[in-house]
From Swiss-Prot:
It is found in: Late endosome. This is Regulator of MON1-CCZ1 complex. InterPro entries: RMC1 (IPR040371), RMC1_C (IPR009755), RMC1_N (IPR049040). It comes from Drosophila melanogaster. It comes from the Eukaryota. Keywords: Endosome, Transport. 'Bulli' is the nickname of a classical German bus from the 1970s (the Volkswagen Type 2 van), which facilitated cargo trafficking.
Length: 642
């Protein structure tokens, strides 16, 4: 295993939850549903301290309860912390009601059965499921009547079970045939799901080899086993892919090691800890692997590395305090799903965190790294950093094929999100209040155009920037994503800077840039660079039928006749302002143009007002005088203003 350079991609949370360590007087229990840890002294007679994440000083409840004989096997609060369930005997469970944070010890409800109770789980504030050797039964606890009532049951022989609180699913190992059967357990509901396909009907699966968790929102049964050929250990990943579908072996994680292992899931990664080497292996089932018989075989993302060393600050009167270097992968460690590590002897409970930045150093394949970061909850900024490095000066645009693939990966996700947003906007009638709309869940990492523009702006005006921008634009077009304003303006700036006017003309003609008044005006602002730019802008304005702006541009360029023709066709004869066009024609100092424009409006006047004269409201007196002075032969009788 490679532990060089002190690079660690897994770390323990800096502030562990501290509790009384295991001793002759203190027993420690953990409830993985509420994420609460119980330190029970003298069977509860001298105190029970319950701690969990998120509470002030991590203390949830502290109380005492009577020792009713028999060692405590399991202890768990209801979700609202108002009923405490305690199992001391193999065939009974006690329910202690609470008022505030103190128990009502005079109102203990004892529920006894004739079976062997393997364990229990709370499924609601007042409902608990008992899992015994004969089946699963859901009970309602009625404190007011000091009763426990059965509301639902499933009869099945059970050897052991595993529980996934996030999915409310119990995995039952049956007495007959060693089958693994998932069961959905909710309030007043028990639903038996198709059994896990183990391949060999006689295969015996031990409880210690099975982990139940969720990966990418799908329930996963992880089974540790040795490879029949090599003898090395591997993990089978069986996924519950949908209602009514049997959990199927979809992936195999090749550990290539022997010894003791434990499994966590962190940020949708499967983390396999190897005690002998003191390393943790990372697997991502979303990444491609070797496919054999429709099963994907995965190797670790990188060579295994140790969890980051952890120094625990010990209680001390001095301000500096003493630091204890914790033993990693200790034999006293107990792991719970998804990412919990408990050292009962040390009295610490940690959560495992993923360190993204070191992994970016270890995964040299930039495309694979992109695929990896797109699935990480905090991968966006790191992915943007990676892309920024790829387009930076040191690469000088030589990694265009790699960038092309990366753009495809991020834009495929981006396109799905854009399409989903469009569907949500168009599927609802306008009178539906937005508060009632179901909000779309964005992808884990969403790289939008504005994110990319911020990266591209850092390499503006470099020789290869145009090539990278064209590559990104082509990728957007491939996924039918329209270029937005900021990106369109940046592409225009680069093309104009490089005098790539033919490329600019093609992009506009194929509508690959945003067609808007703002972008067209941005083009016009650069028209002094080359006359071709002005025509490109006019072409764009024509596509969006922004005739008013085109007319202004043409008038500014002295193309008065063209502007007049467009105004007549787009605005209608009666709405064409005579003064504006006569003034523009006068500014050209071309008598022929002025004459043509003047005569056009005379004919208009004749058609609209049955006279050649201009209405006084149009304020054309100076142009009438200019016409009369310039073309006296046309006006033997001076034309008045009507």
């Amino acid at each position: 295993m490679d532990n060089s350079n002190g690079i660690h991609y897994i770390e323990l949370t800096p502030n562990p939850i501290r509790f009384d360590a295991v001793s002759q007087l203190t027993n420690v229990f953990f409830d993985d549903s509420n994420k609460q840890i119980f330190a029970v002294r003298s069977g509860g007679a001298t105190g029970v301290v319950v701690k969990g994440p998120g509470s002030p000083d991590d203390v949830v409840i502290s109380f005492c309860m009577s020792d009713r004989g028999g060692a405590i096997r399991s202890i768990k609060f209801s979700p609202d912390n108002q009923i405490l369930a305690v199992q001391r005997k193999e065939n009974s469970v006690e329910f202690i009601c609470f008022q505030g944070d103190q128990p009502l010890l005079q109102d203990i409800i004892t529920h006894q059965v004739k079976t062997l109770i393997h364990g229990f789980v709370w499924v609601h504030n007042r409902e608990v499921a008992l899992i015994s050797n004969t089946g699963v039964e859901v009970y309602t606890v009625v404190p007011e009547k000091r009763q426990v009532r059965s509301v639902k049951s499933l009869s099945i022989g059970i050897k052991w079970f595993a529980w996934c609180c996030d999915a409310n699913v119990a995995l039952l190992c049956t007495s007959e045939g060693n089958s693994l059967i998932p069961v959905l357990v909710k309030q007043k509901v028990i639903t038996k799901l198709p059994k896990v396909d183990l391949g060999n009907p006689s295969r015996d699966v031990q409880e210690s080899k099975v982990t139940l968790g969720q990966v990418y929102g799908v329930l996963a049964v992880l089974i540790l086993q040795s490879n029949s050929t090599t003898g090395l250990m591997e993990v089978e990943v069986h996924l519950l892919n949908g209602p009514g579908l049997a959990p199927r072996k979809c992936h195999v994680l090749r550990l290539s090691l022997l010894g003791r292992f434990a499994i966590n899931t962190v940020d949708n990664l499967i983390v396999v800890h190897h005690q002998a080497s003191g390393t943790s292996l990372l697997f991502d089932i979303s990444l491609p692997g070797e496919v054999i018989n429709e099963i994907t075989y995965h190797t670790p993302i990188t060579p295994g590395r140790s969890i980051k060393p952890f120094g625990l600050k010990l209680p001390s009167l001095s301000p500096d305090g003493q630091i204890l270097q914790c033993e990693l992968y200790s034999t006293h460690w107990v792991l719970f799903q998804p990412n919990i590590v408990i050292d009962a002897k040390l009295g610490c409970m940690w959560f495992l965190n993923l360190c993204i930045e070191p992994l970016c150093q270890l995964i040299s394949d930039r495309i694979r790294l992109t695929e990896f970061l797109l699935q990480r909850s905090n991968g966006k900024q790191m992915l943007l950093k990676v892309i920024g490095q790829l387009v930076d000066d040191q690469y000088k645009g030589t990694l265009l094929p790699v960038l092309e693939t990366i753009f495809s990966r991020i834009n495929k996700i981006y396109a799905s999100w854009v399409q989903l947003e469009l569907q949500n906007q168009t599927a609802q009638p306008s009178n539906v209040k937005t508060t009632t709309l179901k909000q779309s869940t964005p992808p884990i990492v969403l790289i939008e155009q504005l994110d990319m523009v911020q990266i591209f702006q850092r390499i503006a005006r470099r020789p290869y920037t145009e090539s990278i921008l064209m590559l990104y634009l082509q990728s957007l077009n491939k996924f039918n994503i329209a270029a937005q304003e900021e990106l369109s303006k940046m592409i225009i700036s680069e093309l104009i800077s490089n005098r790539s006017f033919d490329t600019l003309r093609r992009l506009v003609s194929y509508s690959m840039l945003l067609e808007s008044k703002s972008v067209a005006c941005f083009l016009l602002s650069h028209s002094n660079v080359d006359t071709a730019i002005s025509q490109v802008a006019i072409d764009m304005l024509g596509r969006i039928e922004a005739h008013e702006i085109i007319i202004e541009v043409m008038l500014g360029q002295g193309k008065v006749i063209d502007a007049l023709r467009l105004a007549k066709n787009s605005m209608g004869l009666e709405k064409v302002p005579a003064r504006k066009f006569l003034e523009a024609a006068h500014k050209t100092k071309d008598d022929l143009i002025f004459h043509s424009v003047y005569r056009f409006f005379q004919m208009r006047n004749l058609k609209l007002y049955e006279t050649l004269s201009f209405p006084k409201a149009e304020q054309c007196t100076e142009f009438i005088q200019h016409y009369n002075n310039t073309f006296p032969a046309d006006n033997p009788t001076r034309q008045p203003v009507s």
